[in-house]
Amino acid sequence: MDAQEKKYDASAITVLEGLQAVRERPGMYIGDTGVTGLHHLVYEVVDNSIDEAMAGFCTEVVVRILEDGGISVSDNGRGIPVQIHEKESAKQGREISALEVVLTVLHAGGKFDKDSYKVSGGLHGVGVSCVNALSEKFIANVFKDGQAYSMEFSKGAPLTALQVLGSTDKRGTEILFYPDPTVFSTCVFDRAILMKRLRELAFLNRGITIIFEDDRDAGFDKVTFFYEGGIQSFVSYLNQNKESLFPTPIYIQGSKRGDDGDIEFEAALQWNSGYSELIYSYANNIPTRQGGTHLTGFSTALTRAVNSYIKSHNLAKSDKLSLTGEDIREGLVAIVSVKVPNPQFEGQTKQKLGNSDVGSVAQQISGEVLTTFFEENPQIAKTIVDKVFVAAQAREAAKRARELTIRKSALDSARLPGKLVDCLEKDPEKCEMYIVEGDSAGGSAKQGRDRRFQAILPIRGKILNVEKARLQKIFQNQEIGSIIAALGCGIGTDNFNLSKLRYKRVIIMTDADVDGSHIRTLLLTFFYRHMSALIENGCVYIAQPPLYRVSKKKDFRYILSEKEMDGYLLNLGTRESRVVFDDTARELEGTALESFVNLILEVESFIIALEKRAIPFSEFLDMFRDGAYPLYYYPPESGKQGGNYLYSNEEKEAAVAANEEAAARIIELYKASAFEEIQHNLNEYGYDIRHYLHPKGTGITVSTEDSKTPNYTCYTLKEVIDYLKGLGRKGIEIQRYKGLGEMNADQLWDTTMNPEQRTLVRVSLKDAVEADHIFTMLMGEEVPPRREFIESHALSIRMSNLDI
C-alpha cells in the first residue's frame, strides 16, 4: 500500500466508548485472569506493533521479559500519535493527548480509521487500554517526528502528564507494563508460551523481525524470529524431520473483493509420508482454532481439485473405493491465512471466523491455484494421488479393525477391557484411572488404591509407537486397545467423544528410570496424536513416584528428584555446621552460612547454563584476559575448527560489521549484569568464580557440633558443597527406588496415589507447533535429526541422572 495515503496523526484516532468495566470484569476482555489472560496482555500490545507492520510501517518488534518480571514491547513503527485529540478534549473539558486517549479509553485507536489500517488483528479495539487498566504500572514511550515522549499510568489512570524527553533519532513505540497482582492469580510470564505466539507472528508476516529476550535468566540467549518465506517457511518448519513427498510447499495467494473491501487469502501446503493431518488457520494473524469459513473454503477446494484431477486423468484405482476429504488430508501440513477488513468472529476469543464471503473467496482462489499446479506438476500430482489412495485403503482396513475391536469389547464387557480393575464410582468427574507400568506395580496399585474412585490398568512392556503406525495397526495392538476400551471415548477426529470419557483424570504412572520415561513418552505420543482433546481439556496427568526414601531413626520422608535430594542433604549438612575463613577468621553459621551456600549454588547454576552452550567451565576460566572473562562465543562455520571468544559488545559489533551472518551465530554466554552480581557477592567473601574449581591458597574450615566429626578444610567452593552434602548423609538411611514394584501397597498409596499427599503433573499443550516438532523428531522415522538433537543436548545431562 502507499505509505503516504493519509497522514497518521491525532485525527485518525476514533473513540467509540468509555473504559471503567475492564477492572471489574477483566475476563470479558482477556478471557480469564489466570495464565492465559496474563499472556494475552502481551499479545494485545504486540498486536499493535504487528498492525503497524501489516500497514507497511514497521520492520522490527522487540519483546523482553524484564529482570523484575515486567514486560517491554518496542517497535520501529510510526509511534502512537501524541497531539491533542480535539474531540475527546472537548468531551472531557481538558486538553488530552491522542496517546492518553489510546491508552485510557476503551474502543479507541487508529484501527477504526480505514485509511490508517486496512486490516487489523485487534478487532475489538480494547487491547492496549485494557492492558493499561489491568497493570499496576504502565509506561508508554513514543519516538515520533524527532522527539521522545513519555507518560506513566497505574491501573488505567494517568500518573503524569505527557512529557517531552528531548530530541531523538529513534521512531516507534515502547510499552512497559507490570500486571496488577490483585487481578491475576499469577504474574509470572512463561517464555515458552510467548515464544510460540511470536514465532507464529513472524511466520504469518513475511519479512518482519521479532526479537525475544528474557532478562530473568542469565543463561538464556535472545531469540530472533525472521522468515523471508512467510507461511511457506512455516510449513517447511512443521515438516522438518518428516519425509516430505516433494521439496517445496505449494503456495496459494490471491486477493478478491469481499463485502467490506479486499480480502487477501494465502495458504501453503505440503504432504509428508506420515499419517497425521496438521492444518493451522488464521484470520488477521489471530489463530482460529475452530476453523471457520476460510478453512472450509480451502478444504472444499482441495478435495475438489484432487478428485477432479483423478477423474480427468483416469487415475481411479477402483469404482468401489470412494475418497473422502480425510483421505486427501492424510499426511498434509498446511497453513491457511486470511486478511479481512471487517472479520466476524464467533465470541470474544475469536476461535472461529464467520464471514460468509471469505469462504467463497478462499474456495475460488485455492481451486484456481491448485488446479493449475496439478496440471503443471504431474509428477507431484501423481505422488499425492498415490498417497491418497493408500490412505483410503488403510481407512477401510482401519474401519474393519475398529468394528472388530468394538464387537470384541462388547463380547468381553463382562470382564472389562484388558486387565482393567474398575472403581465403584460411576460419575466420570469423580473417577480417575492409573495406567501403570508392569504387572508387579499394577498388583501393588490394585491393593493400595481407593477402590471407590481409582481404577487401575496395568500395561505390559513398551506400547506401540503410534508415530510410525497407521490406525489399522493401532487397533490391532493389545495394550492400546485396552486403553481405548477402558477410556470409552473413542479415538481419532471423527470417532472421539469427550462426553463419553469414563475417567476425568487419566494418570500415567511409570518407573523413575529410562524405560519408564520411554513408556511415558510412548503413551503421551498416543494421547497427543489420537486423543489430543484429553490433553487440551486437562485430563492427562503424570504421577510423581518418589526416587528416594530417606530415614533417620524413626522419622522418614520421600524425595521426588535428584535436585530435591541434593537440597535436602545440603540443608541437613548446613544446619549444624559452622565455617571459618582461614585468611580472615570470619565465621558463618545459621542463616549467614545458608546465604553463602546459596551463592555457591548460583555459581553452579551459572556453570550449568554455560555448559549447555557446549562451553566447558574449565575452558571458560582459561579464557580470562586483561581482567575480564569472555561475554560471547563466535563459533566457526559448519565443518571448520576453532572459534573465537569476544569480551565486549564492541568486539561483537566489530564481528558483525565484518560479517553480517555473525549476528545469527554469535552466542551470548551469560547476562553481564547477573554475572557481575555473582562476582560482586563472591568478592564480599574474598573469593572469585574461578575458586569454584581452583584453590585460593587458604581454605575454609568446616566444623560441626558433633565431637566425633573432626574439622575439615575445603580449598575450593565446590569442595564446600560436596563436604556439606556428605555431612548431611551421616546418620540417615537412603533407599533409591528403581521401580514402582519395589514399593509395597501402603508406600505406593502414601507417596503416589493418596490425593491428600501425592504430586501430579498435569500435561498441557502450551505450544502445539513445537509439540508436533518434538514428537516427530523423537518418535518419528528420521534418525539424523534425532541423533543431532541427542548430541546437541548431551552436555545438558548430569552424569548423576543417567540410569546405567
Swiss-Prot record:
The keyword DNA-binding applies. Keywords: ATP-binding, Cytoplasm, DNA-binding, Isomerase, Magnesium, Metal-binding, Nucleotide-binding, Topoisomerase. Its main location: cytoplasm. One of its GO terms (cellular component) is cytoplasm. The record marks 462, 465 as: Interaction with DNA. InterPro entries: DNA_gyrase_B_C (IPR002288), GyrB (IPR011557), HATPase_C_sf (IPR036890), Ribosomal_Su5_D2-typ_SF (IPR020568), Ribsml_uS5_D2-typ_fold_subgr (IPR014721), Topo_IIA (IPR001241), Topo_IIA-like_dom_sf (IPR013760), Topo_IIA_B (IPR000565). Mg(2+) 2 binds at residues 511, 513. Heterotetramer, composed of two GyrA and two GyrB chains. In the heterotetramer, GyrA contains the active site tyrosine that forms a transient covalent intermediate with DNA, while GyrB binds cofactors and catalyzes ATP hydrolysis. This is DNA gyrase subunit B. The lineage of its organism: Bacteria, Pseudomonadati, Chlamydiota, Chlamydiia, Chlamydiales. The gene is gyrB.
